[in-house]
Amino acid sequence: MIQGERLWQRLMELGEVGKQPSGGVTRLSFTAEERRAKDLVASYMREAGLFVYEDAAGNLIGRKEGTNPDATVVLVGSHLDSVYNGGCFDGPLGVLAGVEVVQTMNEHGVVTHHPIEVVAFTDEEGARFRFGMIGSRAMAGTLPPEALECRDAEGISLAEAMKQAGLDPDRLPQAARKPGTVKAYVELHIEQGRVLEEAGLPVGIVTGIAGLIWVKFTIAGPAEHAGATPMSLRRDPMAAAAQIIIVIEEEARRTGTTVGTVGQLHVYPGGINVIPERVEFVLDLRDLKAEVRDQVWKAIAVRAETIAKERNVRLTTERLQEMAPVLCSEVVKQAAERACKQLGYPPFWLPSGAAHDGVQLAPICPIGMIFVRSQDGVSHSPAEWSTKEDCAVGAEVLYHTVWQLAQGE
């Protein structure tokens, strides 16, 4: 039933908004590029027969009424913002597939008991203000007031950017949904990994979203001459950092489920011929079970302290962020499982290592996700790609999942 070609054409058209010379997409929140993207998607929503509006957080919403307009709403969507020089599938696939689902329903005269709303959430990525999931936090009523003071690289605060975009930060609480008004939230998203590709499958059903902790390590010692300081006398923070990073890899591997990453490292003063006086790096540690993740962190912390003592360097750690894992709803997973079977695809279960808006919505409603195969597992890159055929399959599974949820009492 889904028109895969229409979905693909819209994905490609939206991918031109914010396109960079590299071929990547930069579409940050509350910018002209995001406004153009919202306007384009709003036109798709109207074409699909939806009532279109934006809430106080700037979330773009298209509503299809149900036979009972007072029934709880089924939400389906994702986000339109991107990272710097990202891809054109991360986020937009979920929004545009949601539009395709309700447009297909309307074109075939399909009515549902529950209303359906397609949502394009504001600033999921957090690339501009280094604080993400603003729209979904606002909808859940959990956006902290201090988030409005987060600033971008040019010193513009989130509150100022909202005002520039025509929004009133003081009205943000109005975006919160009342308890008991949302039946479920379903999101179609690219996997951003290689699990489905290795399994040879176009789609998978997400079991849960991993919880993360970010920990900043600072290791300090004396800055000394690289040539004049014998190896036996060195107190080298860089060598200690390298050893600790190997420990992170070792401890994460032990569980079979935990992932540990150091993707950011700064060395001071940064001279070729200077033993560093300070090294800073940030650990990203994730697991679907908080207790497993926390056990891994404790093991890393103990071994890191031992390394620091043995090397006679100073070690401090600071927890920057923590996010609890969220398990997907059995009701949503079962609906997605039935959809896969109906379409002839074996149900394949996998966790999401990346965070998504559903994490924020979980306190107010059951959530679920469907993944589409990513080519080579690449994401947050101009090389991000999922095939037209896989996107269409994902949209079909989404259609049958949403239909089940919207028909039930």
UniProtKB/Swiss-Prot annotation:
Class of enzymatic activity (EC top level): hydrolase
Entry keyword Manganese: yes
CDD domains: M20_bAS
EC numbers on record: 3.5.1.87
Binding residues for a divalent metal cation 1: 79, 90, 189
Annotated cofactor note: Requires divalent metal cations for activity. Binds 2 divalent metal cations per subunit.
Region (Involved in dimerization): 208-325
Catalytic activity: an N-carbamoyl-L-alpha-amino acid + H2O + 2 H(+) = an L-alpha-amino acid + NH4(+) + CO2; N-carbamoyl-L-methionine + H2O + 2 H(+) = L-methionine + NH4(+) + CO2; N-acetyl-L-methionine + H2O = L-methionine + acetate; N-carbamoyl-L-alanine + H2O + 2 H(+) = L-alanine + NH4(+) + CO2
GO terms, molecular function: hydrolase activity, acting on carbon-nitrogen (but not peptide) bonds, in linear amidines; metal ion binding; N-carbamoyl-L-amino-acid hydrolase activity
Annotated residues for binding of an N-carbamoyl-L-alpha-amino acid: 192, 225, 273, 286, 355
Keywords: Cobalt, Hydrolase, Iron, Manganese, Metal-binding, Nickel
Annotated residues for binding of a divalent metal cation 2: 90, 125, 380
Matching SUPFAM superfamilies: Bacterial exopeptidase dimerisation domain, Zn-dependent exopeptidases
Alphabetical list of NCBIfam families matching this protein: hydantase, PRK09290.1-5
Oligomer status and interactors: Homodimer.
Family of this protein: Belongs to the peptidase M20 family.
Protein name per the record: N-carbamoyl-L-amino acid amidohydrolase
Upper lineage: Bacteria, Bacillati, Bacillota, Bacilli, Bacillales
Gene name tied to this protein: amaB
